Amino acid sequence: MKQYLDLCQRIIDEGVWIENQRTNKRCLTVINADLVYDVRNNQFPIITTRKSFWKAAIAELLGYIRGYDNAADFRALGTKSWDANANENEAWLKNPARKGLDDMGRVYGVQGRHWKTHDGTELDQLGKIVANLSKGIDDRGEILTFHNPGEFNLGCLRPCMHTHTFSLLGDTLYLTSYQRSCDVPLGLNFNQIQVFTLLALMAQITGNKPGLAYHKIVNAHIYEDQIELMRDVQLKRKPYPSPKLEINPDIKSLKDLETWVTLDDFNVTGYQHHDAIKYPFSV
């Protein structure tokens, strides 16, 4: 929690005003932020200085794992996080590649599970990684990436957290996640939970122990209409201790995650938090 608050304060103190062309808003921006999450000791990095809706973050992660490309499928899992980008993004609404209501296009999990190759076949990046790690294999290229510039025009949004690299030392699994851009008051809350949970799940289904998760952000920013709430409300609050994430031990394979796992298979214990803060969202 401290590293999150330190980053927010750093943006307030050192950030440079940048005009964002996509949203037509100004952002206070810093370059490079490194966060570390202790998955090994189950120090769940949920925000405590405001109420965090952790279930929506995990639901979104499950949708990525399953390769979903439709906001309705994400809603069925328990999150509305893709409704706006699928249905209110002006550029996407005009894009001939859009198939209709709730269509997201070839974003995130679609790339992770159905990457199109030069010969017209598909590559399941996540499936390959799980297969290797389950055998104790780390080829130094256990990389899951959603960043496919050749298909950016086929999706409603470029991936923000775009690449996850898994590393195996003995029977301990580590994760390094890379993010090109982060709306810190809103997006980082989701991203922290997802990085932590992704490592915990991957360790569990491959029979390894979770180690540390490293989260590297390039462009970290706070939008101009979020500054006052962050500076005068959230940063004035005292954080609570980190809670714990409980995952159903019966989840043992990628197929389990693809088929029967729901939000009921996750629980957060010991979560104390301050009141919710409604930050503006920029589409």
From Swiss-Prot:
Its EC number is 2.1.1.45. Pfam families: Thymidylat_synt (PF00303). GO terms for molecular function: thymidylate synthase activity. (6R)-5,10-methylene-5,6,7,8-tetrahydrofolate binds at residues 183, 282. The active site is at residue 160. One of its GO terms (biological process) is dTMP biosynthetic process. Keywords: Cytoplasm, Methyltransferase, Nucleotide biosynthesis, Transferase. It is found in: Cytoplasm. The keyword Cell membrane does not apply. DUMP binds at residues 22, 180-183, 191, 221-223. InterPro entries: Thymidate_synth/dCMP_Mease, Thymidate_synth/dCMP_Mease_dom, Thymidate_synth/dCMP_Mease_sf, Thymidylate_synthase. One of its GO terms (cellular component) is cytosol. Pathway: Pyrimidine metabolism; dTTP biosynthesis. It catalyses: dUMP + (6R)-5,10-methylene-5,6,7,8-tetrahydrofolate = 7,8-dihydrofolate + dTMP. Homodimer. Catalyzes the reductive methylation of 2'-deoxyuridine-5'-monophosphate (dUMP) to 2'-deoxythymidine-5'-monophosphate (dTMP) while utilizing 5,10-methylenetetrahydrofolate (mTHF) as the methyl donor and reductant in the reaction, yielding dihydrofolate (DHF) as a by-product. This enzymatic reaction provides an intracellular de novo source of dTMP, an essential precursor for DNA biosynthesis. Belongs to the thymidylate synthase family. Bacterial-type ThyA subfamily. This is Thymidylate synthase. The lineage of its organism: Bacteria, Pseudomonadati, Pseudomonadota, Gammaproteobacteria, Aeromonadales. The gene is thyA.
